Structure formats: structure tokens, C-alpha cells
Amino acid sequence: SILSHGKSARLYQSLVYEQKTALAVGADYGLMQADPGLFYFYAVVKPGEKVEAVEDAVLKEIQRIQTEPPSELELQRAKNQIEAAHIFEQDSNFRQAMLLGEAETIGAGWRKVSQFVERTRAVTAQDVQRAASHYLAADMRTTGTLIPQPPQTQAASPAQPH
């Protein structure tokens, strides 16, 4: 949430508002998994801008969170977003059951669900910095670039009966 999720996040502020090189930017990961999983970043490069420049800017923000802990405001905003999402995720008996079932399935145990808010509130700026340094390390990255192809023109063909 500090790097992504919202217009006040570091990536959005940097790439969309300040540098104006991206139309959208963010990050996400799967929280409910037993083993290490995918944490990914994405950006929609503004027409006319270089993909490499946007990638470099994303990497600079990753490096920044590894070397500069989030401010208290950033940390509290992230905690509020995470807590609200967790509460809204349980807005029905079905969703509560799914969440408890997922926790059991991955071996975390259903009790972890009830401890989630408390554990989130206990996270410190140094915890965020330490996790970013460990999990977002340069030697653990894979980069992919999706480049749209120009539309192909089709020769006019007579209508085919069905």
C-alpha cells in the first residue's frame, strides 16, 4: 500500500503526477499462500514515453523503500487501507467462510484470520524496510514487457454464409 494502491502511493505520485511518464502504476501479491509467491509491479507507459525510463523509475522507488523507511503518515495510511480491505472482505457469511477455509488450506490456521488486524497494526516502518530489502532484492527479479502490436489490416472479403 505504501508503494501502490491509491493516488497517494509512492509509485503513483512519482510516475503519474511528478514525472508524468505513466498513466497507471501499481503492485500486488497474493496474501493467502503458504509458500513464497509472486509480488509484481506494473505500469502503463504514457504514449511517447520510453518503457526503460518507467522501469528505471519503478526500480528507484523499490530501492528507496529499501533504504528509506516510510513516514509515519505513509505507514498509518497503509495500515488503514489494509485493515479496511480485510474488514470489507468479510462482508458476508460466505466470504468469512472462504477466508477461514483458505487459511486452513494453506496451513496458516483459521485463528490467523482473527489476528490479522492486530498483527497489521504492529508492523513498524523498519519492518517494511526490512521486508522490502529481503523480498524485493535485485537478484530475485524477473522483468517482462508487453508491447502492443500495430493492428493488422485485413483485406476485404466477401461475406461468408453461415
Language model regions located:
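Proteolytic maturation boundary segments
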Residues: 115-162
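Soluble periplasmic/extracytoplasmic beta-strand elements of cell-envelope proteins
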Residues: 26-28, 40-44, 142-146
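Envelope-exposed proteins and targeting segments
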Residues: 21-23, 37-39, 63, 139-142
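Short acidic/His-enriched helical or mixed secondary-structure segments at domain edges of catalytic enzymes
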Residues: 10-25, 34-36, 68-114, 118
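M16/insulysin-pitrilysin zinc metalloprotease superfamily fold
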Residues: 6-7, 30-89, 159-162
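Glycine-rich, charged/polar anion/phosphate-binding loops
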Residues: 24-29, 128-130
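Active/ligand-binding-proximal structured segments within catalytic/core domains
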Residues: 1-3, 13
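Buried hydrophobic packing residues in well-ordered domains
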Residues: 15, 41, 58, 82, ...
